[in-house]
Amino acid sequence: MLEKKHQQTFVQTEQNLFFAQVVNFLKQLYVLIKPGVISLVIFTALCAMLLAPSDKSLFIKGVALILIAMGASGSAILNMWFDRIIDSKMDRTKFRPIPSGNISANTALGIGLIFSFFSVVALFFFANIKASILLAFTILYYSVFYTMYLKHRTAQNIVIGGLAGALPPVIAWISISGDQIFYPLISVSYTHLRAHET
């Protein structure tokens, strides 16, 4: 009887430990996707969806919004993965999930790639190819061009890289309005240029 009680206690302890590890991992993943940035992506994309002419169902709109946020999360994770060495040397960033060791670099890279790939492919099926291609371009622009090139070569990196932050509402517009692409592109181009005038 006593042995059985010990076994039950051991199993309960193992379950509690596993649950705590899962919760901690999700907390670290939440930090990894840069929630402040993602909330802005969701907000601007939602505004675009509300303004765009469309007869799509709320379900399709909701899925498209989630996929855009997932793509943005994937690129944010890839950004953190690439900057992990630099982050480990700065007081402001050394406690981020990867440099602190709370999430391994390989795990972060895998999640970032999965989020990015899945969001692009799924947006193609749930929305259209134009939105999918533009989402792929945005992910590559931010996680490769901005993160790996601009940040380390020019003080104007935010100005040029800011295009990645301006594209989610364009993707949202296109994802539910189909071919009506030129108006949002002109609008975002004008807004981006005016915002960074010197």
Please report, for each region that a protein language model flagged, where it lies by residue.
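Membrane-embedded alpha-helical segments that form the functional core of polytopic membrane enzymes
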Residues: 43-44, 51-82, 133, 140, ...
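Interhelical loop and helix-boundary elements at the membrane-water interface
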Residues: 25-37, 97-108, 145-164
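The first (N-terminal) embedded transmembrane alpha-helix
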Residues: 34-48
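Conserved small/polar residues in nucleotide/adenosyl-binding loops
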Residues: 191-198
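Multi-pass membrane catalytic core of lipid/isoprenoid biosynthesis enzymes
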Residues: 92-133
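Transit-peptide-like, low-complexity N-terminal presequences
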Residues: 1-26
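Small-residue-rich segments of transmembrane alpha-helices in multi-pass membrane proteins
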Residues: 44, 160-174
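Acidic (Asp/Glu-rich) catalytic motifs at the cytosolic membrane interface
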Residues: 72-99, 194
